[in-house]
Structures are given as C-alpha cells and as structure tokens.
Amino acid sequence: MGLVEIRDRDVKLVMVGGKGGVGKTTCASAIALQLARDGRKVLLLSSDPTPSLADIFEIPMDDEEVRLVKGYELFGLEVSSDIVLKRWKERFGPEIYEVVSSFASVDYDFVDYIGTAPGIEEEYMLHFIVELVEGGKYDVVVWDTAPAGHTLRLLRLPHLFLKHMEAATKFYMNMYSCLEKVKDAVSLKRTRRSLLEIIQSWEELSRKIIDFTRDGGRTRYVLVTIAEALGVKLTERMLNELEDNGLPVGNLIVNYLVRDEDCPFHKIRREMQQNYIEVLKGLCSGRNMVTLYQSPYEIKGLERIGDISHALFSDGD
C-alpha cells in the first residue's frame, strides 16, 4: 500500500534508518519530497558522517538550513559533529560550568573538554532534533540517520543517561552537601541554582527525548534494507533492538530489487532476492513492507527523486 500512513498530519518526525549502502538517504529524500508536495513545511536532516544530501539534490549545503526545491517548503541540513558540539556548548555549557566550578576553580574552556566525552554528541543530537520538531518552525522533520550501529547506540543513550542520573543523584548530592559545609573555609563558589535542580533538568530532558521517540502518534521509523543475507540479518537485529527500546517500526523498504529476468545474471539475482523477501515478510509480520526496484539511472536531481517518491507512496509495486 506504499508509505501512506507516513502522510498522517500528526506525524512530526520520520526516522529513516538502515545499514550503509542500502539507499537510506535516497529514500529519506523521496519521503521528504512527498511530504513537501502534500503542502507541509519539511526539514530533511542528515546526521550521516558522510552525508550526501547535497549530491542527491545537486545543491550546495553548509551548516545552515537551505531550500532544496523551488516551489516547495522543503529544506535540508547536513549536521556535522562541529555543529552539534557548538550547539551543545551554547545550550549546556553554562550549566556544565556552573556545576563544575562549584567544586573547583576551572576555566570556561573546561566545557570544551567535557564536550569531547563519549556519547555527548549523540545525546545532544537527539535533543537537537526534538527541539527542531517541537519548535514549530517545521511541520515535520525527516531524519536521515547514520548507519545502523551508530543509530542503535544513539537511541539507547537517553535511557542509559537517565539510569546514570537516577543512580548518581544520591552520590552527587551527598558530595555536594559536604562541600556546602566547607564552602566558606575553602572559598568555593555558590551557584545560582542548586546542583539538584540542574541534574533534575537533565533527567527531565532525557525523559522528554525517550517519550518523544517512543510516541507512535508523532514518530515513525522507516527501516531500509536489501534482499540479501546481510541485509536480512541486520534488519532482524534492528527490529529487535528498536522494539526493545520501545520505538515504533511500522514500515520496511526493500531496495534495489531486480524487476525482470532478462538475462542469466538478473535471473539468478531475482531468484535469490525473492527467497529473502519471503524471509523479510516473516520478520515484518504486521508491518508495512514496500518494495523498490533498482533504477537504471543515478538517483540525483528532482526528477529522479520524484520517481522514487512515486514508487514509495503508490498503492502497487
């Protein structure tokens, strides 16, 4: 039936994922184009370490949103690590410094050091996207995620961070209580807010991210794969892990299928793919599976993206 339910006006975030090389960015671009054609204001965002939105739409891109197609409210943004770290420092830098400087005398440059810690970039990426969605500037955000392993780690981080905060709050507060008693003696700074208030705000942020990504009414996850052994195995793994994290996976795109058995090579490929499609159907029981045939053309430029968009949202193969 195509990706019909993605066009629901209540949907605010469409996450497009899969392993590298399966056409994930192409599918995300086609989905974003269709939603823009539906009259919605759309941001197509890529967090892939090697983004290709600029190549697909044949338009230069930098660290600001740019209009991708004339006549439509379709904008694109390729988010680099530098952008994420810069915005993280703007949002959390003062709070981090307030906490750390209450214990020790440090320069504000210490915030840069904290920003390089493992997981910071991924955690803030989710916060950045949720803020984009809830800010109201766009009707819907289509997120071309990084390859599978990176994305799974990213989506687990808010839960892990929240568990750490809940377990660590007592320790932090005990230490802070002791320091409060000797502040005058050692000339430690008094913060404008209590440490507990800052920690609680971080906990609330993680809960907000978790709730949003698990909200099946506003968030859709589209998984892109190929009909080969590796694609099937990774699809099974991703479906299981995403379900374990409470994420709604309602749509699967099987890409690069051979349409016709017009030569021995295509005959063998098609037979192999049909076998794996049956396996994928078993894995995706209850979900919408859309098949996408391999194009003889490079997918770049509005016309080719439009062809893919039509194929993804049409009722038949």
Q: Where do the model's predicted regions map?
A:
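Nucleotide-state-sensitive switch-loop elements of NTP-binding domains
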Residues: 1-22, 27-200
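C-terminal lobe/tail of nucleotide-utilizing enzymes
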Residues: 2-8, 206-317
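Electropositive phosphate-/nucleotide-binding environments in soluble metabolic enzymes
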Residues: 123, 203, 274
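Pre-Walker A segment
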Residues: 197-200, 204, 209
